[in-house]
């Protein structure tokens, strides 16, 4: 996970650099004005450990980009899971004189007001982690998106689970030749959750693992919610669950915390 955060942060910082070059080339700003680069980072929440870690890594990457000619100031705000509030925070960042905006949308389908505000002030916007729909990204040439390779993450998850299952036949506790599984999904409609789920399951099937889906629960990428959802699943299916998959580490930790309270034989997959 640390490598994943670092990779996204590096891509973000590189994209910021590219956006600044475009901005400098088109704006006619003086060298004196450009000595300080103000970057505004607005996340969807302040309660997501992955996003918080990613923000910290981005700050470190940008700090490393500073030199005698340029100082970089990073300001951060949270939308607190409310798109209207996030829009207001973006407006505050624009009024404060930010040169570049990095935005982790609350609602990936509702970036229009943010795009309009930024475009009016000619401020590049880099969306990250939650990708706007293509039609929105095509509204303006100074809109960018940086995110993880969710397909690859799903494939890797499926490969790890398949390797364990194929070498541990005892996972199939009821000996029916199928693996009964439940799934903790990150968020309804989130492109990463959709891809990770799809490709983890496809990869297991390609590895000759026959699956039977018992249920899934949305846990919003959150450890506490995952623990609560696992409580429901265990209450309903008990030891009939042979495999648990989750879309991110936080939900996996919540799942483990719940399972630790009531030990279940068999393997749970990450």
What are the residue ranges of the model-derived segments?
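A residue-level marker of the well-folded mature domains of exported/periplasmic proteins
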Residues: 2-5, 26-270
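Sec-dependent N-terminal signal peptides of Gram-positive bacterial secreted proteins and lipoproteins
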Residues: 6-27
């Amino acid at each position: 996970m640390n490598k994943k955060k670092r990779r996204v942060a590096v891509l973000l910082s590189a994209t910021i650099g590219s956006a600044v070059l475009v901005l400098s080339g088109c704006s006619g700003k003086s060298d004196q004005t450009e000595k300080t680069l103000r970057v505004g980072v607005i996340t969807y929440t302040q309660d997501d450990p992955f996003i918080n870690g990613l923000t910290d890594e981005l700050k470190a990457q940008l700090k490393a980009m500073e030199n005698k000619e340029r100082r970089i100031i990073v300001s951060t705000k949270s939308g607190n899971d409310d798109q209207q509030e996030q829009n207001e925070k973006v407006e505050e960042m624009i009024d404060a004189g930010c040169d570049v905006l990095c935005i982790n949308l609350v609602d990936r389908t509702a970036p229009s007001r943010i795009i309009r505000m930024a475009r009016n002030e000619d401020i590049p916007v880099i969306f990250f982690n939650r990708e706007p729909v293509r039609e929105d990204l095509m509204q303006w040439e100074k809109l960018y998106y940086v995110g993880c390779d969710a397909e690859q993450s799903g494939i890797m998850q499926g490969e790890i689970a398949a390797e364990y299952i194929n070498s541990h036949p005892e996972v199939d506790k009821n000996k029916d030749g199928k693996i009964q599984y439940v799934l903790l999904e990150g968020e309804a409609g989130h492109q990463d959750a959709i891809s990770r789920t799809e490709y983890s399951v496809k990869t297991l099937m390609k590895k000759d693992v026959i699956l039977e889906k018992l249920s899934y629960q949305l846990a919003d990428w959150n450890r506490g919610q995952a623990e609560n959802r696992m409580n429901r699943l265990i209450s309903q299916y008990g030891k009939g669950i042979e495999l648990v998959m989750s879309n991110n580490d936080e939900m996996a930790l919540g799942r483990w915390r719940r399972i630790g309270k009531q030990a279940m034989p068999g393997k749970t997959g990450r």
